[in-house]
Amino acid sequence: PAIIIGLLGAGHQAWSAMRFLEVAGQADIRTRFMLALAYDCGLRREELCTVATGDIDPSQRLLTVRAEHTKNRFGRVVPYSPVTGELYTAWLTERRMLSSSRGPLFLSRSPRNRAEPISNWTWSKVVRGLAIKADLPLISTHTFRHLCLTELARVGWDIHEIAAFAGHRRIQSTLLYIHLSARDLSSRFNYTVASLHTCRLTVLQQQDPSP
């Protein structure tokens, strides 16, 4: 059955997200990549901030969300779009200037804690700043998780497929989740929302603003 998953009305939610992304398109490469990955993969804040270098498979465009960083300790493997893949490559170039070591993917550039993993609090502060700039104070990382899942439902994904993509163990209290392979999810993603995400996320591909 078709379902709507969202904090805002579907139309307003999509408009707000697009407005936010347009503002975020002027941000630094780390911020743009993190937003794109959160949106593509329907990530919770902690899942996003704790992504490690070894969690991404660029050849297949797959992200492994490790169970220990999820709300319900249920890991998953999810695909991401070509645009997000390009942003990933660009961020890796900058990350190497901060650290050549494997480990947390998202590092701080602040002189006080240079090359330290970005914290949930720091990321929330970044998103909050962009939300205020866009005059959309209710936008958060979780907004993009809701939008991603709503769009999967809109284009015909089965509720069990959405549960697997989102890392939900159950649908309400009666429906059990269905295990889908990463290949199944990737094929479904490419045939459905990949083009829609690509259209929206191109605003994050803009060049970094001059210092």
Describe each region flagged by the PLM:
Residues 1-211:
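Conserved catalytic core of the tyrosine transesterase superfamily
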